[in-house]
Structures are given as structure tokens and as C-alpha cells.
């Protein structure tokens, strides 16, 4: 009985560890998006300071290519919208993973109690080993 519970407990621990890895990956991804959001907001602010007489370039591979100011502003705006949507998606994913992780912790606690009871019963019943 105790061996069966121990195997089940081990499987649940592995699931919990995988959830923690997924949670860590999602947090890392969200942090990268936050950095991109900050960077793009700075670019948007800088583009807002320019007027039509200024020349704007964008980097395509190793080459700088002239770009219209309006087009550059639109591109940055679209990028900000995309990054914001991705951050919301990551936040939702993080909430789900945290909820799953909490449920997994509760399952682990129950299995640990069952295992301890089985161990105690095994120790309390001499000759059944």
C-alpha cells in the first residue's frame, strides 16, 4: 500500500515540478515583454517630438532605410498594441498556472499524509512487512 502511494506521490511531484518550470518560463517571457514595452514607449515618445522635416530611418538587417514619419509612428503603435495583448495573454497564463500549482500542492499534501499514515500502519503492524 505504502509503495503504491509513494509511486503516486512521486508522479505528482514530477507534475508539480513541471508546473513550476512552466510558471518560470511564463514569468521570464512576461518580463521580456515588459522590457520591450518600455523600449517601444520610449521610441513612441521620441517620435512624438519630431516634425515632418525630420528624417526617420529603420534598420533592415545591416542597412538603414529611410521611412516616413507617419509610417514609423503607425508601426510603433501597432507594436505597442501587440506587446500589450501578449502581456495580457501571459498574465492569464500565469494565473492559470498558479491556480494549477496551488491545486497540485494540495494534492501533494494529501498524498504525503496518506503515505505517512500508511507508513505508520506498516510500522504498527509487526510481521506484515
From Swiss-Prot:
The keyword Transport does not apply. The modification N-acetylalanine is found at residue 2. Keywords: Acetylation, Chaperone, Isopeptide bond, Ubl conjugation. It comes from the Eukaryota. There is a cross-link at residue 66 (Glycyl lysine isopeptide (Lys-Gly) (interchain with G-Cter in SUMO2)). GO terms for molecular function: amyloid-beta binding; protein-folding chaperone binding; unfolded protein binding. There is a cross-link at residue 66 (Glycyl lysine isopeptide (Lys-Gly) (interchain with G-Cter in SUMO1)). The modification N6-acetyllysine is found at residues 21, 66. The keyword Acetylation applies. GO terms for biological process: chaperone-mediated protein complex assembly; negative regulation of amyloid fibril formation; protein folding. GO terms for cellular component: cytoplasm; cytosol; prefoldin complex; RPAP3/R2TP/prefoldin-like complex. Binds specifically to cytosolic chaperonin (c-CPN) and transfers target proteins to it. Binds to nascent polypeptide chain and promotes folding in an environment in which there are many competing pathways for nonnative proteins. Belongs to the prefoldin subunit beta family. Heterohexamer of two PFD-alpha type and four PFD-beta type subunits. Component of the PAQosome complex which is responsible for the biogenesis of several protein complexes and which consists of R2TP complex members RUVBL1, RUVBL2, RPAP3 and PIH1D1, URI complex members PFDN2, PFDN6, PDRG1, UXT and URI1 as well as ASDURF, POLR2E and DNAAF10/WDR92. This is Prefoldin subunit 6. It comes from Bos taurus (Bovine).
